[in-house]
């Protein structure tokens, strides 16, 4: 057991370091190339997203979704376990300082997610049924002109859908329901399988309609509950912020040199959890944004900036403050149970049930969203209906199995798959960054604030 534990810890160290060097590096580079536009053109970003929320563009194609539905579906895959369970895991593994690095990484992630969405819309095409399809596999194929890398990404995407989009989600939901209501893990797993199985036939249009209603409501309720906790614990907040920044930039970490600092535990865990939360650089969100009804790749890319802000900058920070305001991290509670306990200590016993139901709802939406990503990856590789059916059966089986796996094993698997999926996507974004920069510059020339 010790050798297995040692191997897992070593794997986490390697994956964490790779996340920092690859994703943070790409995010910083693109932020500079795009002249920090999420900050400089902040007003335009929000005006062209939420300001146009009820404006419906001309139909982009059969089976497409609105820009907001695309964003809601992408957020369904990120909000929930990454914000509720992932933050708790980050605090236990990397300490309060990890939260600061989640926030820092989220700023640079905005440019990265913007870039991959722009490319997804620019290189999208229509399938045999007249549906818009896009994503990294298409800009790898037609932009980088590497069908091999496109196929590799598709294989990795289909594989990752079983980790971040499946095992981690069902595990979080099952753990939360058991902690709050004593529901056995297999029961929650079976209910999740039934829900996902019944909705498989709806396709992207149905998923978009569900998520555009469920995600805003659940996120709003969760933020209101979090605000109540923080108001009741307001006197603790100054000390919490001091602790977070002190541990994020500790002298001990800095003494290891710049490289030692960058691969220190708080930075590793913060960036890795931040990526799990907002998925910037992974290439998942571009798959659904590539099907959005839009006449502008840049405007659709703005939604990626908003996603990162809402998901990591806002939701993750709020969750971290709630957990830290409730007590220390040295107990036996982990993941969803730790977050639920934090709400319960301040708001009372019923709060734990609320958190658990929230996690289940978010997890179910995430599983649906990632099933779409996985199916599109499989569809890119083969037109075989049998292959798609095999994927769906395997996906449903994984939902059930994930509910009963250990929390540590699930996160280790998810992080590794996230990294493998991100490598070809980030490489493509960097190779095609001139396309993104040109589109961004031309857009702001035509639409001056």
Task: Give names to the regions the model predicted.
Residues 114-124, 128, 227-243, 251, ...:
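Extracellular/periplasmic helix-exit of transmembrane alpha-helices
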Residues 3, 33-38, 82-87, 163-174, ...:
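Transmembrane helix-loop junctions in multi-pass membrane proteins
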Residues 30-31, 105-130, 136-171, 175-200, ...:
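Helix-loop-helix module between adjacent transmembrane segments
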Residues 57-92, 119-137, 141, 155-158, ...:
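Alpha-helical membrane segments and immediately flanking helix-loop junctions
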Residues 36-65, 89-91, 95-99, 111-144, ...:
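Flexible loop linkers connecting adjacent transmembrane helices
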Residues 22-46, 171-177, 184-245, 378, ...:
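Membrane-interface loop-to-helix entry segments
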Residues 1-77, 81, 92-98, 109, ...:
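N-terminal alpha-helical transmembrane segments of multi-pass membrane transport
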Residues 108-116, 190-204, 215-235, 268, ...:
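Selective recognition of specific alpha-helical transmembrane segments in multi-pass small-molecule
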């Amino acid at each position: 057991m010790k050798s297995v534990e040692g191997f897992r810890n070593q794997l986490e160290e390697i994956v964490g370091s790779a996340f920092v060097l690859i994703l943070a590096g790409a995010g910083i580079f693109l932020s500079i190339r795009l002249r920090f536009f999420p900050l400089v053109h902040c007003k335009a970003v929000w005006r062209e997203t939420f300001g146009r929320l009820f404006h419906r563009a001309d139909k982009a194609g059969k089976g497409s979704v609105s820009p907001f539905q695309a964003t809601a579906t992408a957020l369904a895959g990120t909000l929930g376990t990454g914000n509720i369970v992932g933050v708790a895991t980050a605090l236990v593994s990397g300490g309060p300082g990890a939260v600061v690095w989640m926030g820092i990484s989220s700023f640079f992630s905005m440019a990265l997610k913007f870039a991959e969405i722009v490319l997804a819309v620019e290189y999208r095409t229509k399938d045999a049924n007249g549906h818009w399809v896009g994503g990294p596999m298409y800009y790898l194929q037609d932009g980088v002109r590497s069908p091999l890398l496109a196929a590799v990404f598709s294989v990795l995407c289909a594989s990752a859908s079983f980790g971040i989009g499946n095992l981690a989600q069902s595990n979080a939901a099952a753990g939360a329901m058991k902690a709050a209501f004593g529901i056995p893990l297999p029961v929650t797993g079976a209910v999740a399988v039934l829900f996902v199985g019944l909705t498989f036939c709806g396709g992207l249009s149905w998923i978009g309609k569900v998520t555009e209603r469920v995600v805003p409501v659940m996120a709003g309720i969760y933020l209101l509950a979090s605000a109540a906790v923080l108001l009741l614990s307001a006197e603790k907040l100054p000390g919490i912020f001091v602790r977070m920044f002190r541990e994020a930039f500790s002298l001990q970490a800095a003494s290891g040199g710049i490289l030692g600092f960058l691969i220190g535990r708080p930075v590793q865990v913060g960036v890795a959890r931040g990526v799990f939360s907002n998925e910037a650089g992974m290439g998942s969100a571009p798959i659904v944004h590539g099907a959005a009804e839009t006449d502008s790749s840049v405007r659709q890319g703005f939604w990626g900036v908003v996603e990162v802000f809402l998901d990591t900058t806002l939701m993750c920070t709020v969750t971290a403050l709630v957990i830290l305001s409730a007590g220390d991290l040295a107990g036996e509670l982990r993941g969803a149970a730790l977050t639920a306990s934090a709400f319960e200590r301040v708001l009372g016993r019923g709060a734990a049930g609320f958190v658990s139901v929230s996690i289940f709802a978010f997890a179910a939406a995430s599983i649906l969203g990632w099933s779409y990503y996985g199916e599109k990856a499989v569809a890119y590789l083969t037109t075989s209906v049998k292959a798609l059916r095999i994927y769906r059966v395997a996906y449903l089986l994984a939902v059930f199995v994930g509910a009963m796996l250990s929390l540590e094993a699930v996160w280790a698997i998810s992080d590794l798959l996230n990294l493998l999926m991100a490598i070809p996507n980030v490489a493509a974004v960097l190779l095609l960054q001139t396309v993104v920069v040109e589109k961004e510059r031309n857009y702001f020339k035509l639409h001056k604030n």
